[in-house]
Amino acid sequence: MRLLLLVGVLLAATWQVGYTRAPTFPDKSKSAADAINEPKGEHVCTVKTIVDDYELRKVIHQVVYNDTEQCLNPLTGFQCVVEKRGQKASYQRQLVQKEKYIKQCCEGYYQTKDNQCQPDCNPPCKKGKCVEPGKCECDPGFGGKICSSSCSIGTWGLGCSKKCDCENGANCDPELGDCICPSGFQGKRCEEECPIDKWGPNCVKSCPCQNGGKCNHEGKCVCTDGWGGEYCLNKCEEGKFGADCKFECTCQNGATCDNTNGKCLCKSGFHGALCEKPCSEGFFGAGCTQKCQCLNNQDCDSETGECKCIGWTGKQCDIGCARGRFGLQCKQKCTCPGLEFQDSNASCDAKTGECQCESGYKGANCDERKCSADTYGADCSKQCSCVMSNTVMCAPNTGFCRCKPGFYGDNCELACSKDSYGPNCEKQAMCDWTHASEADPANGKCVCKSGRSGANCSQPCPIDFYGPNCALQCECNGRGIGCHGFDGKCNCAPGYTGHRCEHHCPALTFGANCEKRCQCPAGVGCNPITGECECPAGRQGLKCDISCPEGSYGPECKLHCKCVNGKCDPETGECSCEPGFGGADCSTSCPKGKYGDACELSCDCSDSYCSRQTGKCICPLGKKGTLCDQPCEANTYGPQCQLTTTPSQCASTDPRNGVCLTCPPGSSGHQCEQNCPQGTYGTDCASKCACADGGHGCDPTTGECICEPGYHGATCSEKCPDGKFGYACAQNCPKCAAGSSCDHISGQCVCPAGLEGATCTRPCGVGFWGNGCRQVCRCTSEFKQCNAQTGECSCPAGFQGDRCDKPCEDGYYGPDCIKKCKCQGTATASCNRVTGVCICHPGFTGEFCHALCPESTFGLRCSKECPKDGCGDGYECDAAIGCCHVDQMSCGKAKQEFEALNGGRAKSSGATWLLILFIIGLCGVLGLAALFYRNKYQKEKDPDMPTVSFHKSPNAEDNREFQNPLYNRQSVFPDSGAFSGSSEGGVGAAPDGLLTLEEEDLEDKKIHGGGASRNMRNHDYASLDEVAGGEGGPATSSSSGVQNRRGQNSGDVRRPLLNSEDVDDDDEDEDFEEIPHENRNSTQKLSLERNSKFSEKNFKKKFLSENPYAHIPSPDPNIQNSTNSRRAQENLYT
């Protein structure tokens, strides 16, 4: 019998090697593997957890089984099937909970492949990294909870936490913070305006404007005053000024106006707004802005500034007139008698020339003393003490003695020596007495002899001087080259003769000593020096045969006419003036009221001039009429009042130029046609508005702030309250959807992210996102679909990345590539990135490409067939490429990949099948032999039918079992619980505290992740054999490969249910009670020795050690097959 069991075990093992994977057993190294996979490093927590586990529980069952007995029925071989009852012990796993301490990543962290704990952010950070659970640290330029939004305007940096430091409305780079300047500005903070030759963002574009013009932010030229044209190339014409040269100049007295602002540029001698006033006394020059630099209260020329010195001379009138001079620049000579004498007591007034006598003198020539020569005093009663012979004069008023030269002393009684001089003759004269005759007693100056000069008379006379002290100038009339120093005789030049060269050469002679004869026509002399003919007035040429051209006159026509407004006589140069002019040079216009030739005619104009030629009155600005006696009417001005002013608020205008004299508060300009410039108000626009940024300037008259739409308040500093907008916040906002707001300026609904429309009720269309859906999705896929709030791209199936521009990586598919492909590895298949469908490589098939092509097929989708007669010696049919040589590298590669993928599982080879067939045949022979000898043994040992021996207390829990471990039987629960007193029969629920099979399988699914129960059982109750065999045992149970289902039977295959031996050993020592069988007539005692049969425990040790996988299903309890009954009876006693 042991031999038969061994053969059965071997057969089962061989069957499983050929057709099934090795069963899975509990991993004894699981705890070690768990330790290896435990997280390490930071953020690791140790937690106590409750884990599910199973414990074995023995269950005692009431069973009904079939047996065979000898009977008289020959049709059944004298063996009849009878039903018998008994007890059976089985073991069932019970789910229990146990405490266990494990290491795992702390809450908010997840374990990586290298067993580190990293923070978990869900949803994941888009443009940043997860630094804490649920907290993203955004890359520069991005913000939001998951870093999916670009920084808003005015912020930048990590988490958009920094504010842009820019001016003039500039934004900054969201990553670097660099200011992005608007058009017209540059600099690190956009604080600088563009240079005059640049414009645009960061001032990189060249400005074509000329002459100081600048480009505005659109690149158009803004010209300076005085220029116009597209590029400011056109200068204002004379008489025009201002912007676009649209204003007329109205300057007088020949003044010009500035083409930029219209200011009159007066000629010298005039001033005033229109240059209509002559310079005041003491001022001169253009605009009379220069002050005369004359001293002593003297005036200057209003045009040149030259001092008009009367009674004074010098550039600044700083020198008084010399004795005997008076008048302008002291040019006039006094006519007072006696002034020609040095000692005259007369003088004249420097300004008027009136003669005056010094004090103490009288007479027409002031040469008469009031007192006698030797008396003085008011009444001439005092006697002079002077030596009158040595005295020039005794002062008539003081009696002071004025000594003659060469005398000194109080009374002039002493004479100076030859070489002394000065007051009291105290100074010594330094003369060369060889050439000096005497020294001046007054100043000690040496008096040189003729032909000598110099301080001490040691130098000869210069070339043009002669006589004592060389004081006399040679009188050669400019016709000689110096003279003799002693007597002054001239050295005459050619053409002259005489002591003083006072005589010309005689007629018709010229040259040195007048020795040459002239070669000129009769009556025409020649130059006494050169001999050239000297033409008479009005003629020119070498021979004096050409008349003077117009504009010249005189001898040889060398003189130029000075006639300004006329012609001159070619001989005399006398001017013949044009009408309206007079004077020697015709430069004098007719005086006011005169006109015609020589200004002889008179005109009768009222306070105006008349034409010098025609006598027609020329009215000044502001006058009109034939005689210019009528003033301009209101709103007219200019010459003859022909110009009209534009209607304005001006109270009165200047009739000369139309400029408003007094503009009302709030206006400016020539005609008060302009409001005050932005930001100013009041009279002369002198006050500045005090309005905030929300103001659009102020009222030019009152200064009251004019608020921009959306603002209100005295200074326009307050925004409109909620629900209001527009000017003065007078308009009501529309009903915007919840979550949106009304713009305080325009009244438009300001939609939040994801909404658009007039009232923010319409979600963003495809391809748009953000506030008001103004942002365009940056996704590159053809769908352009992104999150309406954040702009995050919603990638279609098959794409991923921030912009959905990256295809799914291998092994992933679907929207955003978040689904993992179920294909069995990349070696056997590729996964469709859109649908996830596995696309099998050649040689593989199945939904997940997990199987090789069936035998005799190969290629893509296993669509090709191998040759029916084989590939030939040394060749095989590869599942991928078909027939190939076994030594070819790629031959058999698909099979290798399949085996590697399935852990080495492969189809059984032909040798395995031969071994199986051999074992089956051997088992058949041994089985027949065993059956023959068994029947023979039974007949010889005990011809009677056996009885079953039960314990005397069969209802005791520990004795509810059969003691024959080899008996084939079905374990069955009573219908309503075998141990609760309910009715018996059928399969019922598990006793209290135990799990039913369904509950057990359900708990097993919870632990092991769903799917089929890991027990892989199809019978009602687990036996100890199955528990010992691991978690499930073999997947198949018959040679036909048909899996048994619960409540089904496949042929004659049976499931031996082995009784447990976990009961106490004392149970084996108890006696057994004979229980009569229902169909027997006599009771027999069957005494079975404990050492003559297997206990269940010994059998399990023996049987399971030889074959841990052995498991043969129990038969269906309803089968009443005689063969089964007979086999059961035979097995009972084997």
UniProtKB/Swiss-Prot annotation:
Query: Which stretches does the entry tag as region Disordered?
Result: 941-961, 1024-1134
Short name of any one Pfam family annotated for the protein: EGF_laminin
Source organism of this protein record: Caenorhabditis briggsae
Q: Which InterPro entries match?
A: EGF-like_dom, EMI_domain, LE_dom, MEGF10/SREC1/2-like
State the source organism's domain of life.
Answer: Eukaryota
> SMART domains this protein is in?
EGF, EGF_Lam
- In its UniProt record, which GO terms are filed under biological process? actin cytoskeleton organization; apoptotic process; cellular response to unfolded protein; defense response to bacterium; engulfment of apoptotic cell; establishment of protein localization; phagolysosome assembly; programmed cell death
Sequence motif: YXXL, positions = 1021-1024
Give residue ranges for domain EGF-like: 113-148, 156-191, 199-233, 246-276, 553-587
Q: Using the record's annotations, give every residue carrying the modification Phosphotyrosine.
A: Y1021
Q: Tell me the classification of the organism that encodes this protein.
A: Eukaryota, Metazoa, Ecdysozoa, Nematoda, Chromadorea
> Can you name one GO molecular function term for this protein?
scavenger receptor activity
Keyword ATP-binding part of the UniProt annotation: no
Q: Quick one: signal sequence residues?
A: 1-20
Q: Which gene encodes it?
A: ced-1
- What is this protein's name? Cell death abnormality protein 1
